[in-house]
């Protein structure tokens, strides 16, 4: 028996089941696909696929449906992804080009991804720890108060206010010098790599001005240390309701898992590691978790397709985005959509 032919039979079963939601029988395969073999041979191939755990027979039907293992083989053997149409690409570009700031970009992206995939879309905000500093601005306010503004390459803006004793407020020349030195050592560098340079800055200033420099350094370090920076946005939850027949028991565990941001953040973090392996094997950096590959019990009947975005290289993502839906998913189209949106989002943030 040909392993390649058996794979073609599995591909046909996956495509038909995704398209029709109906278990697939040998007669349907003969009628819909030019497999070039007899119905008896197809039945034998289906029996072998079932014995190997790639397809299964639901209790109520004589047809077969793909298992998580079957979907995994189907995804792993995808050689190409269907590209988006020129009209779809133009629509994505136009939508993101109109965004006015980072929040608007992220909001437009998550809604767009949900719309074109008909799944739940999730977009992680760019992590401050993985972004590059574009510029630091120091803005004197009231006496003894200074606003520190950090602008990242992703468009993210972090602001912190420093309170100083009125008699310890620096003069304009000191503020200007610190601003210049901060940008000289920091602009164009990843935020976590500023540590040594920041520690050296006070040595360039008079002892009387060093408490001020230390205070600025402290708020920059504080911004990096904050755990609250990791957050996500989500859209398209209603799409799950349209797929409720794909969840044999109940959709409630999925909805409950989606309500827990920590679950989704952990999942995206795990998929970031998956993407490193996928990038070396398939070259596209698209990570796919299928069914029970998801460690959270509430997501055991779902699949997640994710990709990194931002950064100057494929392995330099500043955050991740993805979609979640039933395992009965159009994987090639969904993977292509996630890849395309991630690329356009990267360009939009790169400005």
Curated annotation (Swiss-Prot):
Disulfide-bond pairs as recorded: none
Record GO terms (molecular function): DNA binding; DNA-binding transcription factor activity
Keyword Transcription annotated: yes
One annotated GO biological process: negative regulation of DNA-templated transcription
Keywords: Repressor, Stress response, Transcription, Transcription regulation
Protein role: Negative regulator of class I heat shock genes (grpE-dnaK-dnaJ and groELS operons). Prevents heat-shock induction of these operons.
Annotated protein name in UniProt: Heat-inducible transcription repressor HrcA
Gene that this polypeptide is encoded by: hrcA
């Amino acid at each position: 028996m040909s392993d390649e032919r058996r794979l073609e039979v599995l591909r046909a079963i996956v495509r038909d089941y995704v398209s029709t939601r109906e278990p697939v029988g040998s007669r349907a395969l003969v009628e819909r696909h030019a497999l070039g073999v007899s119905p008896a041979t197809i039945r034998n191939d289906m029996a072998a696929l079932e014995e190997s755990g790639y397809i299964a027979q639901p209790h109520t039907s004589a047809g077969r449906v793909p298992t998580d293992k079957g979907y995994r083989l189907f995804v792993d053997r995808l050689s190409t992804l269907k590209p988006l149409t020129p009209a779809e690409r133009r629509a994505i570009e136009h939508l993101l080009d109109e965004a006015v700031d980072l929040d608007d970009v992220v909001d437009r992206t998550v809604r767009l991804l949900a719309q074109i995939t008909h799944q739940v879309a999730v977009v992680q905000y760019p992590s401050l720890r993985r972004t590059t500093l574009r510029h630091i601005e120091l803005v004197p306010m009231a006496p003894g108060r200074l606003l520190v503004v950090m602008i990242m390459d992703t468009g993210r803006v972090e602001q912190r206010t420093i309170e100083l004793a009125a008699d310890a407020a620096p003069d304009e020349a000191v503020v200007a010098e610190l601003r210049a030195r901060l940008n000289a050592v920091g602009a164009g560098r990843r935020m976590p790599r500023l540590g040594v340079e920041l520690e050296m800055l006070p040595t360039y200033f008079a002892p009387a001005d060093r408490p001020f420099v230390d205070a600025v350094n402290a708020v920059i370090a504080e911004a990096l240390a904050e755990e609250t920076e990791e957050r996500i946005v989500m859209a398209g939850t209603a799409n799950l309701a349209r797929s409720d027949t794909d969840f044999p028991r109940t959709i409630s565990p999925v909805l409950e898992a989606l309500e827990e941001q920590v679950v989704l953040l952990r999942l995206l973090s795990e998929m970031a590691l998956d993407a490193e392996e996928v990038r070396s094997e398939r070259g596209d950096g698209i990570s796919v978790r299928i069914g029970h590959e998801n460690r959270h019990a509430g997501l055991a009947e779902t699949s997640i397709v994710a990709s990194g975005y931002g950064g100057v290289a494929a392995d330099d993502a500043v955050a991740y985005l993805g979609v979640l839906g039933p395992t009965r998913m159009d994987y090639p189209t969904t993977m292509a959509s996630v890849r395309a949106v991630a690329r356009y989002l990267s360009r939009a943030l790169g400005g």
